[in-house]
């Protein structure tokens, strides 16, 4: 019996309109009633997630910023990692061959010099907003991650540039087709979930996890049961062919799977039924 369930948010637990559906909320409450520990593992900011969970009437442990912050159910900081100050300074002062917008996550919010109100659509539930600022004026310490937003091909080319200049000093992953993230070396959802599991006297074998993007890869591959969304990035499905594919986020595929698992765990699951 698994004791902890970890959920990615965008493309997994959230529907396309960025809400948690009713069937999904019911399934989450059933997990809690069955003694399961809920964990929400996301690239979103802690402040964003607290707003979403408060609005939805659900609570759980939080792995935010793609593993850069781990908090308990009361918001107490359990673990965290920041980018080295010299890397942040290097990224901000280097004239990269790209038109990608740059976004920086810190404990006190989301900072960018790119004013695009369309980016706020995904944060209506929480009312979380970016803060317009000159990025070179931000402190170089205390930065969790740097995000680059642009069409995928442009980001793929930028990723090559970044890796050539920084080598193994940082990690890079696509949290969506149009979002490339720069994270502290060794920082990912899987590593953060392992640290949280240890804090809870569990192992990753005691956990199940759900995800759809490359920032979920380490988490899905290391837990006792990893579930890949039907709408997952093709690269994720290709790199984790051994994992079961369930329904799509817009169909509340997580809820569909959990209802089956809670009622008939001994039967083979199919997302079509």
UniProtKB/Swiss-Prot annotation:
Cofactor(s) annotated in UniProt: Mg(2+)
Entry's Gene Ontology molecular function annotations: 4-amino-5-hydroxymethyl-2-methylpyrimidine diphosphatase activity; magnesium ion binding; phosphatase activity
Gene3D superfamilies reported in the protein's UniProt record: 3.30.1240.10, HAD superfamily/HAD-like
EC class name: hydrolase
Catalytic activity from the UniProt record: 4-amino-2-methyl-5-(diphosphooxymethyl)pyrimidine + H2O = 4-amino-2-methyl-5-(phosphooxymethyl)pyrimidine + phosphate + H(+)
Active site: 8 (nucleophile)
This protein's UniProt keywords: Hydrolase, Magnesium, Metal-binding
Positions contributing to Mg(2+) binding: 8, 10, 212
HAMAP family, per database record: HMP_PP_phosphat
UniProt function note: Catalyzes the hydrolysis of 4-amino-2-methyl-5-hydroxymethylpyrimidine pyrophosphate (HMP-PP) to 4-amino-2-methyl-5-hydroxymethylpyrimidine phosphate (HMP-P).
NCBIfam families reported in the protein's UniProt record: Cof-subfamily, HAD-SF-IIB, PRK15126.1
Name this polypeptide is given: HMP-PP phosphatase
Organism: Yersinia enterocolitica serotype O:8 / biotype 1B (strain NCTC 13174 / 8081)
Name of the coding gene: cof
